[in-house]
Amino acid sequence: MSTCGPCGSLFSPASFRENCLPFLKELFASVTLPHHLHICGQTQRHLSLLKETGAQAISIDACVDLAAAGRIFSPETVTLGNIESAGVLLRGSPAEVARAATVMMDSMAGIADYIPATSCGIPRATPAANIDAFLDVVRSR
């Protein structure tokens, strides 16, 4: 199960704590299926609050420092992310995707409970060669 929304960009941390966190805690406490949380946009100021949701994993958008998120989430919560799906993955060359994936993977060295992933959904027009380049880097690690 996945839940997604833009509330990280729309709410201040105080407003997120008051309006979103109680609902997300209740939701994730009641779910027995594997699940993760993805909040689109800039959630850097919300990282510790996201961990408090109780989600098994948290997916980070490309505009957020992935390594900083991993240091906050690990080892209790899995970090997912965050190659830029609407940027380099969609518009870059396979070589550019491979470089970005390598930088992403290097930034997470030493952080437990990490799953390399895209920053958001993969756009339909993403070249298959770019997806392959991303997966090749991930598999080589």
At which residue positions do the language-model features occur?
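Active-site loop segments of alpha/beta catalytic cores
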Residues: 1-141
